[in-house]
Amino acid sequence: MADQQAGTIVGGVRDIDANANDLQVESLARFAVDEHNKNENLTLEYKRLLGAKTQVVAGTMHHLTVEVADGETNKVYEAKVLEKAWENLKQLESFNHLHDV
């Protein structure tokens, strides 16, 4: 199914406009790191958001590329956060190491 105004496919992953609600996206990135730390008993430190994409599913899936500090080593992870505003739900779906910086 296509969204004719935006020219995108519903359900497709699309880049988030860098100027669109930066604080909300950064908040989701920090949430992802905090949740991963809680789930894995780690102490990764959020450094910065490197990229963000979004996908409309049964809610919104945010695909976030984040840089974190793991002791003296900076690492890049891809996080997926599911958000369902009508259920007041925010859930970390995955948090995968991509590479060291």
From Swiss-Prot:
Q: What induces it?
A: By wounding, nitric oxide and infection by avirulent pathogen.
Its signal peptide is: none
- Highest taxon of the lineage: Eukaryota
Where is the motif Secondary area of contact annotated in this sequence?
A: 55-59
SUPFAM superfamilies in the record, alphabetically?
Answer: Cystatin/monellin
Can the keyword Acetylation be found in this entry's annotation? yes
PTM sites of type N-acetylalanine: 2
UniProt entry keywords in alphabetical sequence: Acetylation, Plant defense, Protease inhibitor, Thiol protease inhibitor
Instruction: Please list the GO terms describing molecular function.
Output: cysteine-type endopeptidase inhibitor activity
**Sorted alphabetically, which CDD domains does this protein's record hold?**
CY (cd00042)
Tissues and organs where the protein is expressed, per its UniProt entry? Expressed in roots and developing siliques.
Q: Where is this site: Reactive site?
A: 11
Kindly list the GO CC terms recorded for this protein: cytosol; endoplasmic reticulum; plant-type vacuole; plasma membrane; plastid
- Domain Cystatin intervals: 11-99
Q: Which GO terms describe its biological process?
A: cellular response to cold; cellular response to heat; cellular response to water deprivation; defense response; response to wounding
Pfam families assigned to the protein according to its UniProt record, in alphabetical order: SQAPI (PF16845)
Q: What does this protein do?
A: Involved in suppression of hypersensitive cell death activated by either avirulent pathogen or oxidative stress.
The record's PANTHER family line, in alphabetical order, gives:
CYSTATIN FAMILY MEMBER (PTHR11413), CYSTEINE PROTEINASE INHIBITOR 1 (PTHR11413:SF122)
So what family is this one in? Answer: Belongs to the cystatin family. Phytocystatin subfamily.
Name of the protein in question: Cysteine proteinase inhibitor 1
**Which organism was this protein described from?**
Arabidopsis thaliana (Mouse-ear cress)
Question: What gene makes this protein?
Answer: CYS1
